[in-house]
Structures are given as C-alpha cells and as structure tokens.
Amino acid sequence: MRVAIISDLHGNLKALDFFINYIEKNKINIVLNLGDILGGLSPIEAMRIIKNDERFINVCGNHDEDLVFLDDELSNDEKIWLRNIPKSRVVNLYNKKFLMVHSRKDNNRDIPILYTGESIEKFLMDYEGDFEYVLFGHTHYQCLLSFYEGKVLINPGSLGLSYDNKISFAIININKNEFNIEFKKIDYESED
C-alpha cells in the first residue's frame, strides 16, 4: 500500500492538479491531508476537488478555520463540510496508528515544534493516545524526527506554497513486511 501525505495546499490548483496526476500514475489510493486547503488564488476550487475525492482523509488547518471571507461563495453543504473537518484524527493503516494534526491542539496558528527536545515534548503532550506516528504541517518544511519515546514525527512540507516553488509531499510504503517514507520535492513541470 502506498499512502501520500500532504499539507498546506493554500488553494494552489496547479500544484493540486500535478499531485492528483502523480498519485493516479503511481496508484496511490489514500491521501492524508494535514490541512490548509484554503488560502491562495483558488481556495474554493481546490476545496471542491478535495471534498469530492474519496482518497482524501483531512484535518483542519488554520486557513480552513478562517472561512469567513469565503462565506458568500460557499454552499451550505460546503460550509458544513469545512466546519466538520476535525482538528485531529487517528488513522490505522496495517496496524500502525497515525495521528494527523495541522499544528497545536489549542491554537492552529502556533508553530507546532521548533525541533528541540523540549518543544517536541510540549507538542506531543497536546495529544494523548496510542499512536506511533505524528503527521503535522503548518511549517512548510519537510522533516522526519524519530527519537522521542519511540514516536516518529513527519512533516511533508507544503504542496502548494513551498519556500522553493516546488511541490513537496511524502509517500509511505507500507505492508506487512515494509515501512518506509519517501520525501518528494518536484518541479511543477517535472515528469518524476
């Protein structure tokens, strides 16, 4: 099974179209989306694509909470869908539990972690539960941290608003005998 992890699309339709073509070409049927669908140039169009694609499992980002500026352009069904996206959720894949979050539990705008032992501990204390992997976004930087009490922290970077104008995301290859993570950083016009 191959699973994609994305975050921080920020309404970038070109990046979303490229990504959807990539996952179709590579037979990826599950997308763990860590929030911030909205924002940018085409937030409503991006939201509609993700809302209607059953491959996407979503959590809410800080931009998704700020739907007030789009209120006149959304249908009631779309408003309800956005308001009902959870801030966190645990997904079980091949008996491995993944906590999905965008940022901090009490404030989605806070920086999740600063990659120090103390800030990681505070970040993980936000979320109680039995999970092995913590998937988070918000910083737009890819990272893999695997040293805190056996938990692995993964940030896929930003699909639509990266600092180097490339699409960034992660792929998990998972089955009974294999588990590995690939970080992808692709130019929009690339054929990777």
Where are these regions (language model features)?
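His/acidic metal-ligating clusters that form di-metal
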Residues: 27, 77-144
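Beta-strand-turn-beta hairpins that frame and shape the catalytic cleft
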Residues: 1-4, 90-99, 147-152, 176-181
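Short Pro/Gly-enriched beta-strand edge/turn motifs at strand-loop
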Residues: 72-76, 125-128, 150-158
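Core catalytic region of metal-dependent phosphoesterases/phosphodiesterases
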Residues: 2-92
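Active-site environment of divalent metal-dependent phosphoester hydrolases
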Residues: 10-15, 38-42, 64-68, 106-108, ...
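Acidic, His/Gly-rich catalytic cores of divalent-metal-dependent hydrolytic chemistry
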Residues: 145-192
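Glycine-rich His-Gly loop
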Residues: 8, 103, 158
